[in-house]
Amino acid sequence: MARPTRKTGPKKAKKNVPSGVAHIQSTFNNTIVTISDIRGDVISWASAGSSGFKGAKKGTPYAAQTAADSAARRAMEQGMRQLEVMVSGPGAGRETAIRALQGAGLEITLIRDVTPIPHNGCRPPKRRRV
């Protein structure tokens, strides 16, 4: 019996996007880097977990650097040259991710911290007792 041929979906066309926005969400447990165009359509993304790190190693600066480098390379294949960077969260990989984006060859035009800070909003969870 002959094998059924696989149907492949339409190939994603390469966009030519010269500038965009990189969102770096850095928590204590992971770092997620998302690169989008100016309208907000995602061009590439990577996280410490998707870069092959597991468990507590996902929260390290090196894992954030690897994730940012991976996302930057994929964005540069789409023609990305300039970036605005929005950094969010208290994690260890904030600065290393920005340096990795610069090191990959992207020109950073703006760095903005968009970490949400409550103006006395919800009651925080109770303190941990270890």
From Swiss-Prot:
Ribonucleoprotein in keyword set: yes
Disulfide bond entries: none
GO molecular function: rRNA binding; structural constituent of ribosome
PROSITE patterns documented for this protein: RIBOSOMAL_S11
Gene Ontology, cellular component aspect: cytosolic small ribosomal subunit
Pfam families: Ribosomal_S11 (PF00411)
GO BP field: translation
This protein's UniProt keywords: Ribonucleoprotein, Ribosomal protein, RNA-binding, rRNA-binding
Family to which the UniProt record says this protein belongs: Belongs to the universal ribosomal protein uS11 family.
Role: Located on the platform of the 30S subunit, it bridges several disparate RNA helices of the 16S rRNA. Forms part of the Shine-Dalgarno cleft in the 70S ribosome.
Subunit structure of this chain's protein: Part of the 30S ribosomal subunit. Interacts with proteins S7 and S18. Binds to IF-3.
Protein's recorded name: Small ribosomal subunit protein uS11
Organism: Synechocystis sp. (strain ATCC 27184 / PCC 6803 / Kazusa)
Lineage of source species: Bacteria, Bacillati, Cyanobacteriota, Cyanophyceae, Synechococcales
